[in-house]
């Protein structure tokens, strides 16, 4: 069963590496906030009402983060880059499948 807590545990390492993403609890679930480097203003905030929504959002954030790391943000991503990032995401998808049993 997915819970907010185990989703956050699974993505703990990623969230520790990405200085622009933060997840905070709120009355309606959890909010993922994106910061713009050193700005005091956030870029966006997304309310996740269910653990599934939080998982999906963090997986997409992780995918984007790893793709930017591969390209260093200096070139267009290739199909090989995208495939490599898909492979990095697979353990998260496998974990989700097991957690939903």
Q: Where are the language model's segments positioned?
A:
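Negatively charged, low-complexity tracts enriched in Asp/Glu with abundant Ser/Thr
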Residues: 1-21, 65-68
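Short intrinsically disordered terminal tails
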Residues: 1-2, 94-101
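A structural signal for alpha-helix termini and helix-coil/disorder junctions
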Residues: 17, 60, 64, 95-98
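Acidic, low-complexity, intrinsically disordered interaction modules
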Residues: 25-88
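Intrinsic low-complexity, glycine/proline- and repeat-rich
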Residues: 88-94
């Amino acid at each position: 069963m997915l819970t907010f807590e185990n989703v956050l545990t699974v993505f703990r390492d990623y969230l520790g590496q990405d200085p622009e993403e933060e997840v905070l609890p709120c009355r309606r679930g959890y909010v993922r906030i994106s910061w713009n480097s050193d700005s005091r203003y956030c870029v966006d905030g997304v309310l996740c009402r269910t653990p599934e929504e939080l998982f999906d959002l963090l997986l997409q954030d992780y995918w984007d983060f790893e793709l930017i790391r591969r390209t260093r943000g200096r070139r267009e991503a290739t199909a090989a880059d995208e495939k490599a990032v898909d492979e990095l995401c697979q353990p998260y998808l496998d974990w989700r499948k097991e957690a939903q049993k």
